């Protein structure tokens, strides 16, 4: 596990390169425009970061970051976005995001059974193979909508459905162990948005998970019991630990509204809030496209919600994307989730947007077909 953490970025780059090669071999389908508009504005934000780092920071790092982010966008364009041509591939896209959570949770569960304090915990909070507990929380919460889709979409009770439910319970428990209030908000937001029109299904899921936790938690060893209480206390704290950072970011933006605060290191550093971090670091140059990206994501959420009302057959698919985007956007106000270039929040945002665009494209195609049929009569 320690070796995985130490070599995580190189392994990710290798996998990214393999996906690029695989994507290049994929033929075009019926969809022509594959990249959702919000991603273009996210690219504009990265361009602002690149320019500032290039002019005032480390030139080598600027080009490396730009190349990495460009490769991620190209991978999404050639791979997942192009593969989305039918319902089967949509479900594969959701499955792939869920499997990120499965691999992460089960790998760290295995490590915890061997030695709970090696790698998986730092300062009493779960971090897994990530850099800190906030990163772990963002990864775990970002996969919750996909688990709910896989559970609700499988009508019959079998081992596969039990596996997804068990995985969601494990994801939820590790999310609790991060002690991250941001992660808790993201997870709760995703659940509420997913079941926004089906309160009965939400109650059944909560009761089922509650029963499973009541059975499983007493079976955990004493080390887990000693960890639970200090972590639980973090969720009842009312202290705003980010107020000083937010105030500093706001003042940095007010003092340098066009291009942000002067760069004092080799690269830009971000934290605590996507919007304030972008404003403080890049000024209006990066803040404006970031806001447009956020508004574009909200516009997609509204369009998908309306789609689920008009065509209930797409309720599960639409709810997965709506809850996924809501989850990430809610977390963006307390963590700089969208300003990285090779992070799970950025990649999952692109995947959710690509999945959402596919659903809207399908709806547009169906509407055009129905219009054509009416003109033929």
Q: Model-derived features: where do they sit?
A:
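Hydrophobic core segments of transmembrane alpha-helices in multi-pass, intramembrane catalytic enzymes
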Residues: 9-19, 63-77, 111, 134-150, ...
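Transmembrane alpha-helices of multi-pass inner-membrane enzymes
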Residues: 18-19, 321-331, 336-377
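Alpha-helical transmembrane segments of multi-pass inner-membrane proteins
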Residues: 50, 91-118, 131-197, 295-303, ...
